[in-house]
Curated annotation (Swiss-Prot):
<feature type="region of interest" description="Disordered">
    <location>
        <begin position="405"/>
        <end position="474"/>
    </location>
</feature>
<feature type="coiled-coil region">
    <location>
        <begin position="1"/>
        <end position="199"/>
    </location>
</feature>
<feature type="region of interest" description="Disordered">
    <location>
        <begin position="301"/>
        <end position="388"/>
    </location>
</feature>
<keyword id="KW-0175">Coiled coil</keyword>
<dbReference type="Pfam" id="PF09789">
    <property type="entry name" value="CC149"/>
</dbReference>
<feature type="compositionally biased region" description="Low complexity">
    <location>
        <begin position="343"/>
        <end position="353"/>
    </location>
</feature>
<protein>
    <recommendedName>
        <fullName>Coiled-coil domain-containing protein 149</fullName>
    </recommendedName>
</protein>
<dbReference type="InterPro" id="IPR019179">
    <property type="entry name" value="Coiled-coil_dom-contain_pr_149"/>
</dbReference>
<feature type="coiled-coil region">
    <location>
        <begin position="259"/>
        <end position="286"/>
    </location>
</feature>
<comment type="similarity">
    <text>Belongs to the CCDC149 family.</text>
</comment>
<feature type="coiled-coil region">
    <location>
        <begin position="385"/>
        <end position="414"/>
    </location>
</feature>
<feature type="compositionally biased region" description="Basic and acidic residues">
    <location>
        <begin position="323"/>
        <end position="337"/>
    </location>
</feature>
Amino acid sequence: MANQLRERHQSLKKKYRELIDGDPSLPPEKRKQANLAQLLRDSQDRNKHLGEEIKELQQRLGEVQGDNKLLRMTIAKQRLGDEAIGVRHFAAHEREDLVQQLERAKEQIESLEHDLQASVDELQDVKEERSSYQDKVERLNQELNHILSGHENRIIDVDALCMENRYLQERLKQLHEEVNLLKSNIAKYKNALERRKNSKGQGKSSSSALTGVLSAKQVQDLLSEDHGCSLPATPQSISDLKSLATALLETIHEKNMVIQHQRQTNKILGNRVAELEKKLRTLEVSGLWSLPGGKDTILFSDPTLPSGQRSRSPLLKFVEQPTENKADPKDGEAQKQEEDESCAAAEALTAPEDAGRPAVNSPANQSRGNQCKLFHPSLPQLPSEEEVNSLGREIIKLTKEQAAAELEEVRRESPIEGQRSETGPAPPGLAIQGELPKSHLDSFEASRPAAKASTPEDGKGIPEGGGMRSTVKT
């Protein structure tokens, strides 16, 4: 390449001398102009050629630099290994980016640490507040237990009290409605008795005159096949049939009212059962109750546990109640008598009139009696429950006295009707309502020994279980 440049230099020098000397045939002025034009063309060609050479040299320089960098990386890889390559060989701008990312990550870590510390402090405050609320609830439970004169080792559950209060309020409302219904029935029976007495005062009817209220036996006799077609088409028979239809219509209306009240009672009891199931589920989740016979069954009266570790659930009262009754027999008898009275009042006010049912001491009636004993849980007596019991006792007492007086008056005025009632037909008014269960009759007779002695034909004077007695019971 140096030789080529040298030869090129010699040729250019020769051409320059020829141009300077010029063509001797031309005049001096023209010779000078021709030399300048030739020099301009030559310089342009030379510049163009040099520009191409510069581009070629720059391209070769880039290739050589890339080869050099690759060679250096290969040498460093052979000396230091693969791990050190990524650490050592970074460009300047890449290192700056990495440093900036590291700084941002440090700032985020610091902010997260501050947030974590704030969350820990807030959690500590919440724990302290929770402990204060727990202490407050425990003090309130103790105060409530002291107010209600409960046992200090068995704190009363406030939720159970609220649930019981709601249930008793619903039952009280239902009892008021049933009392109004029974009052209307008593008024109707009074009117029937008055009509019967008026008809007897005017004179005896010819044969089978009806007075508006019939017994089941009279209805069966009137509608039997033997006598149904033989009724004469007289005004008396038409009046009897009208009275029969009216009595049956009134009975159907009463039964519809009873069914409606029974549905409302079932709804209230269903809500009560749902609340109790929810309470039991809560106790089961918390570990205070499990299915009987299971591995996790908890015995609240386990003597192996110390008194401080025993559960303070309200269910403990149901377990320890029998032992307390055995320890004090007098108090147990008094409490049993009060429970029987409240049970009788509850049955008298809540149970609908069992019209048309046979007076059989069935298991259903026994279960109702047992259910009445468990009607009041082993919680302190609430004022609403006492009001219900006192109201029921007053109503029962008034209805007993009134019915007894009316019954004696009717028997004095109509001795013939009492003799007829011994054979089976019903007196005016109430036999169509059917019989009461024997448990109700027994409780009623036990509460009225004096009235029973003065009226020995009490059970016979009112056939079909005594409709008046059903009225007295309610």
